[in-house]
Regions:
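Residues at or immediately flanking beta-strands
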Residues: 268-270, 307, 411-413
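Residues in well-ordered beta-strands of folded domains
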Residues: 208, 272-274, 309-311, 320-322
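Non-catalytic nucleic-acid substrate-recognition regions in nucleic-acid-modifying enzymes
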Residues: 154-301
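Class I S-adenosyl-L-methionine-dependent methyltransferase catalytic core
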Residues: 2-189, 313-510
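Glycine/charge-rich, flexible interdomain linkers and switch-proximal surface loops
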Residues: 301-316
Length: 510
């Protein structure tokens, strides 16, 4: 085995052309014993050509692998079997693998063939499984493979979810932002929105639909991170019965009804245990049991449009059905991002906390890709946005994002500049800016020298440019407050930004 691995590593380093034009012909001319000794070549070729962008070359490699399925050596057949799914299965490879499954007496070859058929199998594999009662092949995986072959599946934003008693959704967010998310829902309800706040909990807000709705209507709300349908609460998630309860929740009529109604293409889900540790064994048991209970609800970890998320706390687990929506319809304007860019819902939360004034002039001193500025303009009432950043690449991205947002009623100016050089920025007249808003460098993903000095200067400059009653709204990673008497701290809340706490603060200019 060690010799095979050493040879494989050597062959992996060779150019693809040399592997195919030199090493493969040499391998084909060898006798049975020598071919077995050089079997690592089959593995190397399979891996190297998996990413080939030459369709003719890839097809030729796959044809060679299929021919090896008839080799007298079980080891060579097994290596070729492992390579075929990486190259893309077809009816010919499926047929030959089924033939091997029916004829071989070697257990490890049976297992390898079964694994390959689970990845590329189609109707012929399903028929073979049904006819033979073959237990090595996971029927659910084959059905998922067949579904993928039928084309991509997507969550439909325009599909109507009928009103039904007891239906709840969880709007998840970063810890500390729950009240902002809830306030947005309540305000939207006051304008005729379709959702009502039921409960505010740690990291999520429970809402119920007041009427039939679409996900497009839900995604008009901008402050939540992800949305999911509540499926079940599991008490004592560590108990032996917990996996059974979880499987029943996945296989339930509610899950099936939601997935079928809201999916274009085959409805499939992946199961995610949102906690530390390895949960592979539990996931396998639950998805198998759920399929036994309801074979119309398919598990597919590879390309599923839905995720069943299990969130744990000390006493229970929450089971949610989350649509995997990509791209996010709220970020239609996001053409690109920068390193350490703002978390988009956090930008929307900053804007909401800031409130609105007439004819706003909004400045982000560290604008990055421009999310806070664009979210401010989307909220309305903004006449001018100004973005500064020392990185010219960030400024280019911010300009492109603003253009994509199509905010024709708002003027925009972006400058590659240090925020302290306000004299170079004509749009920043002293005492004219109504809102300074930013998620500034926090010193985590991007190192920032003299953080204390940076934020001291931010307070000073904000005081200079803000008009009376103007606001400074930002994320503060330091235990540092303004000493400027013209800036009054109006609110401060602790927010978890991925393992470390910061403060979302609002200062108002006297």
């Amino acid at each position: 085995m060690k010799a095979d691995n050493d040879l494989y590593r050597q062959l992996r380093e060779l150019p693809a052309a040399q592997l195919w034009n030199v090493e493969v012909p040499k391998f084909d001319q060898l006798g049975p014993k020598e071919r077995n000794q050089q079997v690592a070549l089959v593995r190397a070729v399979g891996v190297v050509f998996t990413t080939s962008r030459n369709p003719e070359m890839k097809a030729a490699v796959k044809a060679w692998m299929i021919s090896l399925l008839q080799d007298p050596s079980e080891k060579i057949r097994r290596y070729a079997t492992a390579a075929i799914p990486k190259l893309g299965g077809d009816e010919e490879s499926e047929r030959k693998l089924i033939d091997i499954l029916k004829t071989t007496d070697v257990d490890r070859e049976k297992k390898k063939v079964a694994s390959a058929l689970e990845k590329i199998g189609g109707a012929a594999t399903l028929k073979a499984v049904a006819g033979s009662g073959e237990k090595l092949i996971d029927e659910q995986k084959v059905r998922a493979s067949v579904a993928r072959q039928g084309g991509p599946s997507n969550v439909r934003l325009d599909a109507i979810v009928p009103k039904q008693p007891g239906l709840r959704l969880h709007l998840r967010c970063r810890k500390g932002l729950e009240s902002i998310v809830a306030d947005e829902v309540r305000e939207d309800e006051g304008r005729g929105g379709k959702f009502r706040v039921v409960e505010v909990r740690g990291c999520f807000v429970v809402v119920e639909p007041k009427d039939a709705f679409t996900l497009a209507e839900l995604y008009q709300l901008r402050c939540f991170d992800t949305a999911a349908f509540s499926l079940a609460f599991i008490r004592e998630p560590g108990s032996a019965e917990a996996l059974e309860v979880l499987a029943k929740a996945i296989a339930s009529p509610l899950t099936e009804k939601l997935m079928l109604a809201l999916t274009q293409g085959a409805a499939r889900y992946r199961l995610s245990m949102v906690s530390e540790g390895n949960h592979d064994d539990a996931v396998a048991k639950v998805t198998k049991k759920a399929f036994e209970l309801n074979p119309r609800v398919l598990n597919d970890a590879r390309e599923s449009p839905w995720s069943v998320d299990v969130h744990f706390d000390e006493l229970r687990a929450l089971v949610e059905l989350r649509p995997r929506i990509s791209p996010n319809p709220r970020l239609y304007y996001r053409t690109d991002a920068v390193n350490a860019a703002s978390h988009p819902p956090l930008a929307a939360c900053l804007v909401r906390v800031a409130g609105r004034q007439d004819k706003e002039i909004v400045w982000d001193p560290f604008c990055g890709s421009g999310l806070e500025l664009i979210e401010s303009a989307l909220a309305g009432g903004v006449g001018q946005i100004v973005g500064t950043d020392i990185d010219p690449a960030a400024i280019a991205i911010a300009e492109a994002n603003f253009k994509a947002a199509k905010l024709t009623g708002t003027k925009a100016a972006f400058h590659t500049a240090d925020f302290r050089d306000i004299i170079r920025i004509p749009e920043l007249d002293r005492g004219k800016v109504s809102l300074v808003i930013s998620n500034p460098p926090l010193g985590r993903r991007v190192r920032v020298p003299n953080m204390h000095g940076l934020f001291t200067d931010l307070f000073k400059i904000a005081s200079e440019v803000l008009r009376p009653n103007g606001r400074l709204v930002f994320i503060n990673p330091l235990r540092l407050s303004s000493v400027d008497p013209t800036l009054r701290l109006e609110s401060s809340r602790t927010v978890d930004l991925g393992g470390y706490d910061c403060r979302l603060e609002v200062y108002r200019k006297r």
